[in-house]
Amino acid sequence: LLDDAARFDELVNEMANRAASRRSGAAVPSLNSVFQRLAVPQQHRAVIEGTFRTMCRLHDEGRDHIWGYYVRNLARPMWLAREANRVDVLVGNPPWLAYRNMTTDMQAAFRRMSEARGLWAGAELATQQDLAGLFAARACELYLRNGGSFGLVLPNTAIDRDHYRGFRSGQYGDATVGTSIAFSSPWDLRRIRPHFFPRASSVVFGSRADGRPTAMPEEAQIWTGRLPAPNAHWEEANDVL
């Protein structure tokens, strides 16, 4: 079903609209006409019907009518992670969340996933570790095609601190089946005032290069200057940086 994103979206819209338009407590409507119109294979119908029954129940309970968006937000990353759908360029600002501020369950998952990719820096540096590096590595692993490029805003510690050493190596997981990154020189933004974020930032660049990792260069392009405001437009910032 995820092979055709437009058809999948139409299916979810139909389910959400039918769940919301039926009378509370009424029988769950049939989806047969939707299945026929969208040519949904027989082997997928039981799972979809089960999901639809859940959507109807949630509507009857007066809970938020967000479930169509919820289903799409779960499914679209799965679609994007398929090799044929991976992107040429990733640009973004991964979430910055220190290990010490994670819940116990999040800490366990973070450590497990970090250890599997060679990103775990050890218990003595655990409280300094940050979700941003794992998020960046995982995003490249799932969504960036081999040869595709990225530019990501990370805490400045990503370019020169010990707890990011595994991230800067460019190899995440086994050399034969893991993800490899070829880094280019990062931007060091710590000397810009005021900071854009509560902590100093950097921008890291590179490309996916499976089997041919290149560690992040130690030399960085250093930006300095004082901005008129943290969110200044580039036309203003360009004159003072």
Residue ranges and their predicted role:
Residues 69, 76-241:
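Signature of N6-adenine DNA methyltransferases within the class I
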Residues 1-86:
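Coupling/switch/interface segments within P-loop NTPase motor domains and analogous charged loops
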